[in-house]
Amino acid sequence: MVDYVTDIVVIGAGPIGIFTVFQSGMLSMQCCVIDSLNEIGGQCVALYPEKPIYDIPAYPIITAKELINNLVEQSKPFDPQYLLGQVAEKIEEYIDYLLVKTNYGTVIQCKAIIIAAGSGAFGPNRLPVDNIIDFENKSVFYSVKQISDFYDKSVMIAGGGDSAADWAVELSKVTKQLYMVHRRKNFRCSPNTSLKLDDLFQRGKINLVVPYQIKQLCGKDGKLDYVVVKNITTSEELTLQVDYLLPFFGTSANLGPILNWGITISGYQIVIDPATCRTNRNRIYAVGDVSTYPGKIKLILTGFSESAMACHDIYHIVYPNSPLNFQYSTSKGIPKV
């Protein structure tokens, strides 16, 4: 039994997936969007909704959440069907269509599939401390939903990559006390962010705790009181008063069932034709960070371009007897789907 019939199934409700809804709608094609998360936005919303983004055309600065909100608003005229909290598990190929089956047993009939899954289904790498679960989502968080939550608080950031460095810079503006714990003195972040960190360290806006790692969390009923850190060289221990802990050790991601679909994979990315974004399988496309080809640049705007190319190629599948006469959106307006 088929639950939904649509033109394109989009796998992934991140920025590229949402923009695909708009691009397909501009070509009078409908979309059904599947995402394993329970909200629209992918990693942008789940991990860093307030993180500033600087390389979106016409926006000198925009937060990840604002970007998602704008993309959702832009795609609204095309009334997409979102299937959230579901995973696309199986694909069945027929002469004129595909069937997509989710882990909930939902069946969608479509003309084509666009995989816009980013890094795939993901979750944060947990801090290796025995009682970490007792504090998660209470005083230990793997993402920042609202910067205002940390106003005038004592906060510890653990990690040495881009996320840890970027959030240290941002949260130093609002916290009462900010600790940055890392195993090494060097941070793996952009040169510009590194300069900002050095300045904040010098001015005492951030307390640098290196080379240390977190040993123990102390508190009651999910509320942190203290964090014990241990020097990895001398074994010296420090007990620091902390209200919130933000571990940024990256995420673990995988393509899940997509790996079983007979699609050519290289380094956990889907190999595509850069001119059309087709995979090696009939009617299946991939766009955004999940896709790869020689010279690929992993930027959001690259994904937007790939989405447009894939939709234009799929148009000929959905409307085989209707030639595509290209028009600029200024002349065309918003079509009715």
UniProtKB/Swiss-Prot annotation:
Keywords: FAD, Flavoprotein, NADP, Oxidoreductase. SUPFAM superfamilies: FAD/NAD(P)-binding domain. It is an enzyme of class 1 (oxidoreductase). It comes from the Bacteria. Transmembrane segments: none annotated. PANTHER family: THIOREDOXIN REDUCTASE 1-RELATED-RELATED. Belongs to the ferredoxin--NADP reductase type 2 family. This is Ferredoxin--NADP reductase. It comes from Ehrlichia ruminantium (strain Welgevonden).
